[in-house]
Amino acid sequence: MKRQRDVRYAVDKDESDDPQAVTDYVVDLYKYYRDAEEKRPMELYMEFQQDINPKMRGILVDWLVEVHLKFKMLQPTIYLTVQIIDRYLSAKQIDRNQLQLLGVAALFIASKYEEIYPPEVADCTYITDHAYDAQDVLDMEMTILRELDWNISSPSAHHWLVRLARVARAPESAAHRAEYFAQRMLQEYAMLEYKPSLLAAAAAYLAMVADEGCDDGWPRACERLTGYTDVELYPCCKAISYHINRAAKDDAKRQLVACKKKFSRHDFSTVSFGKCPVLKRPKLIDLPDLAD
């Protein structure tokens, strides 16, 4: 991966008068995100677990995506929820009858971090069909926070997707498709192999290739932002395509349907109806990206 240069993108120049764009700090912010990625969960933590497996994790995440949609939460919340789960499971063994409790407590924590109006603890017990009571959720919340040493914040693929869409000036449909690819990969334990920045870059690349409003290729602006060339993205792109296309026939059997259903909605441009492109050859294109 190439070292990112200190560059100013054209989109930042255009938005320099918008205080919410924080254009004076955005380069430093994404340098921080890159450094913080090194604290991501262990890739092979299931080898340490004795009573759960990747299939159970996938079903849990699928259910959480459904709950996340039902509660109309912000997109960063589901990413943070799954990160909390994986970070906890990287350090602690858990019984399968406590896995859903871990998931709902992680969602409870993430929502209080990301949402303006997080759900009440009573809502969390309700969505589990009262399999756990309020005290169970609160106890698990404290257990998680102590294990993570109260360090909740962690950069996700969503942070990178937002920036990539702006830098590439991607249409809304491409941004939605990249979000779909990235959120669908939250369910796949094997995808923990890839850093959030790499996963986001690969999802964005595939989305731009699939979208009729985008040129076929990896914009140089995106390469400069992430530090990844199209060649470096190829293995992750291939994995995403596999899980969405070849494994699609097994999703119903594995009960992984919530993400596809969520992104079939019109407010997400119905992007889950389409297939994920399969890249045969990396192709680099050039787009204007640097401010004068």
Q: Locations of the language-model features?
A:
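Acidic, serine/threonine-rich low-complexity regulatory regions at protein termini
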Residues: M1-V104, F108-D292
